[in-house]
């Protein structure tokens, strides 16, 4: 009897390990709203991922609308979130900066005081982990135009965003940590004001950058010691009907660094190109440049005097390897 009891205890001890090991492998986890996957929500799939994995795992998300506010925490690495179909696999939330914090939320003290949420809590998806890939999926903040509302908030390093739609209004994409790197390929990014902003290093290639209002595309806050901020290569700048006065960027912090090269610029881009955010001193420090752009909005004759047109030799040095400081990405 004693032996049976000991065996029973050993079995109970091993059960949690067996359950954990089911997802502690490189296999794909399937998420589906209709119950045909292993989980119905993306958050549930994230929760079973092992901390600091030394192998890759894919969270495959079937078509559907997933109303979730998500965090990929710093201890999760080597994860790909891949949608079944870019346009029909949608992660959506609707927080904005002026919403009052909920009691028991991220900052209950602020809620008691009646303080608004603020920009940096409004994300639909926050990525704190590194070596993360987002692919074939839509990430949306569908809040009303009542304040800043972040769709994708990036804090990790070495983040790849490929063939995604990033939808929002003000402050759609936030690259939140200086020097950390993110690359966007074949994406559609839309917004109204400062809809790509922050201090991080980011490379955008073959992306459509869609302006929804007469305002500003970028608001980089690159620190002084960081050579590169935002680089847009072979991108297409478009606008909704009636939008015809858009700046390429304004400096959120004095040393903002932004480059557009080999891009197609629509007629909505203002002739002067860049704005100093109402501070003449920013003209001495902001690092705004262009190279080999084309289209109705690419003419350089009327560009502000404090922006630069790169030479062919200078532009040849602007590669993703040099911007990110490593050969493989």
Model-found features: residue ranges?
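Bacterial Sec-dependent N-terminal signal peptides
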Residues: 1-24, 104-106
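Sequence-level preference for short, compositionally simple segments enriched
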Residues: 21-329
């Amino acid at each position: 009897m004693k032996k049976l009891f000991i065996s029973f205890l050993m079995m109970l001890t091993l059960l949690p390990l067996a359950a954990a090991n089911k997802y502690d492998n490189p296999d794909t986890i399937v998420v589906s709203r209709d119950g045909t996957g292993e989980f119905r929500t993306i958050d549930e799939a994230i929760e079973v991922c092992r901390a600091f994995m030394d192998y890759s795992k894919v969270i495959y998300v079937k078509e559907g609308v997933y109303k979730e506010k998500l965090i990929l925490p710093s201890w999760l690495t080597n994860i790909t979130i891949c949608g079944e179909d870019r346009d029909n696999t949608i992660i959506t939330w609707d927080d904005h900066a002026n919403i009052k914090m909920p009691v028991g939320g991220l900052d209950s003290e602020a809620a008691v005081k009646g303080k608004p949420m603020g920009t940096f809590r409004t994300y639909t998806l926050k990525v704190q982990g590194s070596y993360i890939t987002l692919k074939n999926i839509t990430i949306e903040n569908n809040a009303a135009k009542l304040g800043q509302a972040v769709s994708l908030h990036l804090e990790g390093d070495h983040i790849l965003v490929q063939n995604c739609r990033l939808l929002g209004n003000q402050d759609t994409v936030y690259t939140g940590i200086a020097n950390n790197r993110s690359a966007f390929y074949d994406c559609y990014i839309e917004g109204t004001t400062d809809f790509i902003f922050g201090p991080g290093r980011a490379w955008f290639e073959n992306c459509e950058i869609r302006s929804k209002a007469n305002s500003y595309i970028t608001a980089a806050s690159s620190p002084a010691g960081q050579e590169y901020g935002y680089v847009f290569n072979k991108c297409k700048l478009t606008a909704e009907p009636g939008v015809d006065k858009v700046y390429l960027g304004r400096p959120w912090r004095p040393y903002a660094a932004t480059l557009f090269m080999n891009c197609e610029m629509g007629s909505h881009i203002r002739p002067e190109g860049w704005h100093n955010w109402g501070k003449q001193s920013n003209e001495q420090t902001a690092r705004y440049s262009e190279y080999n752009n084309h289209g109705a909005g690419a003419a350089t004759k009327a560009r502000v005097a404090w922006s630069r047109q790169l030479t062919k030799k200078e532009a040849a040095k602007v590669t993703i390897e040099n911007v990110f400081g490593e050969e493989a990405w």
